[in-house]
């Protein structure tokens, strides 16, 4: 290969269809330099090996592989988290769920709250909550061994003490009750055209099949046995599923049922409160 400079490599990446920022981040990681360095040193030469590795990364990105997989990490709610194949990439819209949870916890002073995160994936939700509320006792459940290993690694990386539990939804939490439960479960319906664009991420973390509501139904149905009276259940869902999820919560006798929108203004999270004095507590 002839001599290739930083500017040449970035121009070639754009011709491949790679976004300018994505290409800069990939090259900065490869060179172990900040992105600003690339801008100030666009005439710096690349070795043959660097050219080859950058071209390979750009080809993968152009084919739709998530940038987070190529970089090996993704920022979420102020925390840089390890991610990789087999683990769902944390989305900024899920921060809506975390912010809502923190509001509820702030409104309930007193003893350290008990919180559960069902289907934790990379640990994003659980770790963001623990980082913001070190006093909280947080339990995170995940059925994927690959994802759970990543979540544990992220916890160690940030020195955050979360109780990691292997299992499916409520199964590892028998006999436990919480003040707050959150979940970002698989909710994309089978056949949804968006799934094709997400083909590099684990299907089981994206879609439960059918109408996309089966895991949400299971979580709502089991929640009364695992929430303290007055406890809250918060759920992420598809932008067109808010009405259906609110109906599930109302059918399970939740009160104060409401929906919040994501960063783009789309209905993204719904939640409700278990009655302060439920029939089972009488």
Residue ranges and their predicted role:
Residues 25-103:
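Conserved AdoMet
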């Amino acid at each position: 290969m002839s001599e290739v400079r930083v500017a040449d490599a970035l121009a070639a990446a754009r011709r491949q269809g790679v976004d300018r920022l994505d290409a800069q981040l990939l090259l900065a990681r490869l060179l172990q330099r900040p992105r600003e360095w690339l801008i100030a040193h666009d005439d710096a030469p690349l070795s043959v090996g660097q050219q080859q590795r950058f071209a390979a990364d750009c080809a993968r990105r152009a084919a739709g592989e998530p940038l987070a997989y190529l970089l090996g990490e993704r920022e979420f709610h102020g925390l840089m988290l390890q991610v990789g194949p087999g683990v769902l990439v944390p989305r900024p819209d899920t921060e809506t769920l975390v912010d809502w949870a923190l509001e509820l916890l702030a409104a309930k002073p007193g003893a350290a709250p008990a919180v559960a995160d069902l289907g934790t994936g990379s640990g994003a939700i659980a770790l963001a909550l623990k980082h913001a509320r070190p006093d909280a006792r947080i339990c995170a459940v995940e059925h994927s061994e690959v994802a759970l290993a990543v979540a544990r690694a992220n916890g160690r990386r940030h020195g955050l003490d979360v109780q990691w539990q292997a299992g499916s939804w409520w199964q590892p939490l028998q006999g436990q009750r919480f003040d707050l439960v959150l979940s970002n479960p698989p909710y994309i319906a089978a056949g949804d055209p968006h799934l094709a664009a997400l083909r590099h991420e684990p299907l089981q973390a994206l879609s439960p099949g059918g109408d996309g509501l089966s895991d949400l139904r299971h979580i709502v149905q089991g929640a009364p046995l695992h929430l303290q009276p007055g406890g809250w259940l918060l759920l992420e869902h598809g932008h067109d599923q808010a009405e259906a999820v609110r109906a599930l919560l109302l059918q399970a006798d939740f009160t104060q049922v409401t929906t919040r929108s994501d960063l783009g203004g789309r209905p993204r999270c719904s939640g409700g409160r278990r009655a302060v004095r439920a029939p089972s507590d009488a």
